[in-house]
């Protein structure tokens, strides 16, 4: 049972060693400063003797030689890459078929005292068949770290570069890839392995002779710069009056007509007052016109005198009305017992009144039958408008209506006796 546990511990230590080698490679050249597990002194661990299944020679792996530190960068060409370390001889190991790895014949178990600090403290593992747990051995104090000696400085110093001929900067030397770490040995190393001396420094090449110095070439003078005109300040902005946008005219909306309220079902009964008497409006003046006038008869005593002295009204005298317009109109009239005549033209309008005249035609009295030209009895008398009668000051209950037509007057006209007729002076 103890052999199975020790084999498990050995496998765990080998796994930790492989992980440590990969972590050192991932962190650059840190492995150069830390000691390798092969440099630690061996420690003896009492283990029971295990019969080896086969006998064979014992192979010892030499420790890897440390790589030389890279030289400082210089303008000289990069040094040649260091020679790779000699290949290590790896013993032939039979294939692992299961169980634990048996040691080689004639070899001793490796010293695990130096590897114990790299292994975490594992808890007590109880055996498979039962029983108290087997305690692992406590690690011993590690040995002090041994740093490799630094490489000796190169005896030849590079000469300073030529200042006249400037060379382009050399690229930084490429780091050589570190060789992969050797696989973990199966057998323990010898108690005092011999360290190989560091390789000799690479040869330093002498600097190449500087080329012949050429006379410095003079560069042509730069062309004169054109004088820039002084920058004038920008003119002040012109203050334009604000543009007033015309307000949109209100849309001509049709007037909203409120609907008439519907009449109630049973409207209230409102007593009606008696309507006042309707008074017919007065007819307009000028429809139809009426022409009136008087006719007189003058005695022989006042012959040739154009007055109404000693004149009397003449009944039965004939007069005529002649209107000159689009259509000529002639109407006749006879005086009454008061010597007055009235003519009512049928188709006469107010506009045609100024184109009408009245003439004397004949007299019924043979002693007074000569018409005179008094007021145009012979040449025609013009119509003159007459004013309607005035209303009384205290009107009666029923007002007096004005005449229904326009009144026009002519004359008066006079008939006289003939001059051949003897006149009685009595």
Swiss-Prot record:
Sequence repeats lie at residues 69-73, 76-80, 83-87, 178-182. Glycans are attached at residue 310. Pistil (stigma and style tissue). Residues 56-109, 121-254 are annotated as: Disordered. Residues 1-23 form the signal peptide. Residues 60-94, 123-161, 168-224, 231-254 have a biased composition (Pro residues). This is Pistil-specific extensin-like protein. It comes from Nicotiana tabacum (Common tobacco).
């Amino acid at each position: 049972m103890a052999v199975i546990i020790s084999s498990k511990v050995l496998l765990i230590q080998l796994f930790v060693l492989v992980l440590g080698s990969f972590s050192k490679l991932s962190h650059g050249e840190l492995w150069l400063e830390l000691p390798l597990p092969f440099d630690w002194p061996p420690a003896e661990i009492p283990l029971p003797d295990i019969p080896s299944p086969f006998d064979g020679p014992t192979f010892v792996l030499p420790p890897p030689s440390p790589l030389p530190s890279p030289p400082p960068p210089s303008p000289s060409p990069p040094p040649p890459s260091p020679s790779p370390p000699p290949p290590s001889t790896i013993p032939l190991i039979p294939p692992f078929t299961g169980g634990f790895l048996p040691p080689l014949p004639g070899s001793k178990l490796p010293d695990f005292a130096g590897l114990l600090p790299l292994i975490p403290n594992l808890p007590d593992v109880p055996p498979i068949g039962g029983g108290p747990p087997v305690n692992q051995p406590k690690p011993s104090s590690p040995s002090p770290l041994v740093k490799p000696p630094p490489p000796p400085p190169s005896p030849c110093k590079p000469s300073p570069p030529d200042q006249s001929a400037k060379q382009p900067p050399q690229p930084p030397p490429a780091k050589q890839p570190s060789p992969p770490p050797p696989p973990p040995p199966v057998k323990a190393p010898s108690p005092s392995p011999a360290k190989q001396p560091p390789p000799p420094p690479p040869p330093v090449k002498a600097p190449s002779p500087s080329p012949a110095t050429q006379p410095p070439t003079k560069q042509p003078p730069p062309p004169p710069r054109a004088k820039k005109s002084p920058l004038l300040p920008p003119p002040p902005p012109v203050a334009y009056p604000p543009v007033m946008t015309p307000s949109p005219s209100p849309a001509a909306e049709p007037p909203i007509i409120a609907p008439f309220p519907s009449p109630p079902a049973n409207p209230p009964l409102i007593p009606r007052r008696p309507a006042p008497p309707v008074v017919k409006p007065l007819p307009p003046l000028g429809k139809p016109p009426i022409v009136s006038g008087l006719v007189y008869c003058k005695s022989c005593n006042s012959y040739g005198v154009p007055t109404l002295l000693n004149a009397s009204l003449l009944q039965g005298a004939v007069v005529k009305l002649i209107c000159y317009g689009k259509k000529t109109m002639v109407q006749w009239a006879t005086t009454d017992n008061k010597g007055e005549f009235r003519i009512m033209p049928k188709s006469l309008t107010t506009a045609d009144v100024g184109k009408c005249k009245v003439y004397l035609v004949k007299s019924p009295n043979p002693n007074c039958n000569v018409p005179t030209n008094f007021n145009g009895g012979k040449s025609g008398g013009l119509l003159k408008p007459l004013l309607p009668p005035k209303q009384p000051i205290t009107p009666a209950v029923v007002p007096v209506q004005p005449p229904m037509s326009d009144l026009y007057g002519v004359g008066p006209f006079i008939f006289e006796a003939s001059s051949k007729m003897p006149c009685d002076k009595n």
